[in-house]
Structures are given as C-alpha cells and as structure tokens.
UniProtKB/Swiss-Prot annotation:
Keywords: Cytoplasm, Glycosyltransferase, Purine salvage, Transferase. GO terms for biological process: adenine salvage; AMP salvage; purine ribonucleoside salvage. This is Adenine phosphoribosyltransferase. Pathway: Purine metabolism; AMP biosynthesis via salvage pathway; AMP from adenine: step 1/1. It catalyses: AMP + diphosphate = 5-phospho-alpha-D-ribose 1-diphosphate + adenine. It is an enzyme of class 2 (transferase). It comes from Staphylococcus aureus (strain bovine RF122 / ET3-1). Pfam families: Pribosyltran. Its EC number is 2.4.2.7.
Amino acid sequence: MDLKQYVSEVQDWPKPGVSFKDITTIMDNGEAYGYATNKIVEYAKDRDVDIVVGPEARGFIIGCPVAYSMGIGFAPVRKEGKLPREVIRYEYDLEYGTNVLTMHKDAIKPGQRVLITDDLLATGGTIEAAIKLVEKLGGIVVGIAFIIELKYLNGIEKIKDYDVMSLISYDE
C-alpha cells in the first residue's frame, strides 16, 4: 500500500513556509491505519520488543495500537507536569529555548527491550530525548519507528546509532 497517498499536506502551517505532513488522514482510514500499524508490529516482532514508548501526542496514537496488537505495554513520554507520579526528566534545546520531557520513574525496567514510536522524524530532538529517558531507566532501545521521515531535516543524524524504520520518506 502506498501510504503517502493518505498523507495530507497543509501549506504554511503551523507557520509560513512550512509544509505540514498531516497523518490524521491515515488514521481516519481504517485500512491505511491498520496497514501502518501492522508494518510497525512486524518490525517490532523482529526485535523481540518488551514494551513500546511514545512521546505525546502522536507517539501515543502510533504506539498504543502497536503495543495492543503485540499484547505488551505502552509507556508515555510527556511534557513536564503531565504525569501524576514520580518522574525522570530530560531537558533539551529547541531553536528558541528549551523543552522538558518526562517519564514515570517505574515505566521501564532495567533490561527491557524498547521500541520507540512517533508519527514523524524531523530534527530528531524529541526522539533523542525519549531515548535518553529510556536509557536512564535502564531500557535498551532496540528500534525506533516512524510513519514519516523528513530526510531533508537530517534528524536521523541524532539517532544514527539506533535501528530506525520509517514507512514514508520525504526528500524535500
């Protein structure tokens, strides 16, 4: 299936000059969403994954159906102040400022094999932060899966030491 045909491109959103790749048009098509989920499940099964991790919010909508399909758990990565129990945190730089992501301190057990999922790889900052959180808890990142990779932003450089798959690539 050519998933690219299900991606909507929204020009000048969220700011002028950006061509936003909207995956909600994959999700609202059951066949396309199921196909994408199943492809990531196949990838995860080959890596003997114990748990799936995804950053808010679109990492949830990719990772949860994968975890459910595999009969394993899902651990969310959230912005600071959004998780109710004790957390670990990772602060990282943005173009203009910083951001903080957190995970529950008991979300990952040492030695667990982790798949990290998100909708899109752009600059790689969010996924790099998720990796740092998983590894701080003793997890082993055995794979990272995206629906879309924006190759022209070169985010893969931040995660080049990991096994990465994306279902759709944009070169420009």
